[in-house]
Amino acid sequence: MIQQALTRLLDRHDLARAEMSAVMDEIADGGATPAQVGAFLAALRLKGETVEEIAGAAEVMRARVDPIRVDRDVFVDTCGTGGDGRHTFNISTTAAFIVAGAGVTVAKHGNRAVSSRSGSADVLAALGVDVDAAKDVVERAIEEVGIGFLFAPRLHPAFKAVAGIRRELGVRTVFNLLGPLANPAGARYQVLGVYEPRWVPILGGVLAALGAAHAFVVHGEGLDEIAVTGMTHVCEVRAGECERYAMVPEDLGLRRHEEAEIAGGDADRNARILADVLAGQQGGPRDAALANAAAALVAAGAAADLREGVRLGAEAVDRGAASDKLARLVAVTRGGA
């Protein structure tokens, strides 16, 4: 199958959703050689991935995942694509604790760094979380604490062999887009940041096709986040429809910040910034985390609009609920109560 698909891609033809799924199944089953996989990924990238192709790939990723059980109808993910190269602190990870502190269950999917010096797994490990905890520990954390970390390499074993091919290629491929689309707990409510604005409507279309209940696909001022530095492009997905609009920090009741104010560093530095935000420190990092938490709270139905989401997030921080979620997640993953 992969050989026929490669020929079609080289002739600049799009693949149908079922064709893409068949190729992904072949890759997962070990039926394609490394050379074939590398050529396929490069040809797909050169042609340009479509909604149907990404959706077909994501369906296989979801079907092949080692699933995490969550006994909740509504829970959110704040996993983005990474790869924006802007080296901010871990905004979406910080936002996840604020969302949990506000009372919404979070199944945070993530990995180690893509282009930054600190991915979500890196910063959480620096904070004391066992990011490679066993499945039952992750499920217990989600149930008892209201937040758990779903470490991608542990939970997507079918595509482990592709990691080496991706490293050798050294360029972005469809796999850079698939992580946030394949939450191992099956989250249908999410905030998904993308590294380029062109992906906002495309991944919005993918989430709509895959049955997302309520999601925000965002790109703000070069960041795979909602920006407090300027304009954010949004595709809000509900009931199979994608509403596109743009917004600025003032629309959320937040002031504008310089990008230097939200700059990060290595995992230890980013851990300090995250902890400071959860401790109530004012400034750009707090506002950036609140903006992204607000979207997750709206997606989950906990807030009527983004301004209310910012207010609820701020209350969760200021009463200590967000920092308590971090402390309890560390304790549970380390074998405590």
UniProtKB/Swiss-Prot annotation:
It catalyses: N-(5-phospho-beta-D-ribosyl)anthranilate + diphosphate = 5-phospho-alpha-D-ribose 1-diphosphate + anthranilate. Belongs to the anthranilate phosphoribosyltransferase family. Pathway: Amino-acid biosynthesis; L-tryptophan biosynthesis; L-tryptophan from chorismate: step 2/5. This is Anthranilate phosphoribosyltransferase. One of its GO terms (molecular function) is magnesium ion binding. Binds 2 magnesium ions per monomer. Gene3D superfamilies: Nucleoside phosphorylase/phosphoribosyltransferase catalytic domain (3.40.1030.10), Transferase, Pyrimidine Nucleoside Phosphorylase, Chain C (1.20.970.10). Catalyzes the transfer of the phosphoribosyl group of 5-phosphorylribose-1-pyrophosphate (PRPP) to anthranilate to yield N-(5'-phosphoribosyl)-anthranilate (PRA). InterPro entries: Anthranilate_Pribosyl_Tfrase (IPR005940), Glycosyl_Trfase_fam3 (IPR000312), Glycosyl_Trfase_fam3_N_dom (IPR017459), Glycosyl_Trfase_fam3_N_dom_sf (IPR036320), Nuc_phospho_transferase (IPR035902). Keywords: Amino-acid biosynthesis, Aromatic amino acid biosynthesis, Glycosyltransferase, Magnesium, Metal-binding, Transferase, Tryptophan biosynthesis. Mg(2+) 2 binds at D224, E225. It comes from the Bacteria. 5-phospho-alpha-D-ribose 1-diphosphate binds at residues 80, 83-84, 88, 90-93, 108-116, 120. Anthranilate 1 binds at G80, N111. One of its GO terms (cellular component) is cytosol. Mg(2+) 1 binds at S92, E225. Homodimer. Anthranilate 2 binds at R166. GO terms for biological process: L-tryptophan biosynthetic process. Its cofactor is Mg(2+). Its EC number is 2.4.2.18.
